[in-house]
């Protein structure tokens, strides 16, 4: 199926865009993944329509399964603790996390928004979101960004 990236536990990531050539798979960037999940949680909060919640939870399930893979632990010290920009599905079905997150603080802001949405929906913060948020924050502070707490 070329329409979504499926994780082993049944979670999904939607591609950022699709090619006219059905055989070409693109990628799912973390900031798009978070924006889609946030949008679905916010639709659920506005409407109480469980279809939105169920879809948000499929994305969240994929994030839970892959959370450690998003955190950069490659040999490039400067980018240690940053988050990879995107996930790609290999021809063998494996997930490959790569590319520099050029968005600077956008992904961090999306993670803060996700944390806020989790609190509203579930009444608590979320471990996966907290781990990604803290890692991105650590990287941004090291890079000299002024991080504003919420």
Feature-to-residue mapping (PLM):
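Compositionally biased, intrinsically disordered low-complexity regions enriched in proline and serine
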Residues: 16-19, 42, 53, 89, ...
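Eukaryote-skewed repeat-based solenoidal scaffolds used as protein-protein interaction platforms
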Residues: 1-67
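Carbohydrate-binding/catalytic loop surfaces
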Residues: 5-29, 72-110, 149-150
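Long, well-ordered core segments of solenoidal/helical folds
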Residues: 1-9, 51-76, 119-150
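Well-ordered alpha-helical scaffold segments within catalytic/enzyme domains
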Residues: 35-49, 91-103, 107-124
């Amino acid at each position: 199926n070329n329409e979504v990236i499926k994780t082993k536990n049944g979670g999904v990531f939607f591609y950022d865009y699709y090619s006219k050539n059905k055989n070409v798979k693109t990628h799912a960037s973390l900031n798009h993944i978070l924006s889609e999940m946030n949008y679905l949680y916010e639709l659920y909060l506005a409407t109480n329509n469980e279809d939105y919640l169920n879809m948000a939870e499929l994305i969240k399930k994929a994030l839970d399964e892959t959370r450690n893979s998003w955190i950069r632990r490659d040999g490039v010290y400067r980018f240690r603790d940053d988050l990879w920009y995107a996930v790609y599905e290999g021809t063998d079905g494996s997930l490959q996390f790569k590319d520099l997150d050029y968005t600077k603080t956008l992904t961090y802001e999306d993670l803060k928004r996700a944390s806020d949405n989790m609190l509203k929906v579930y009444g608590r913060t979320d471990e996966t979101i907290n781990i990604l948020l803290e890692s991105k924050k650590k990287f941004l502070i090291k890079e000299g960004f002024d991080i504003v707490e919420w």
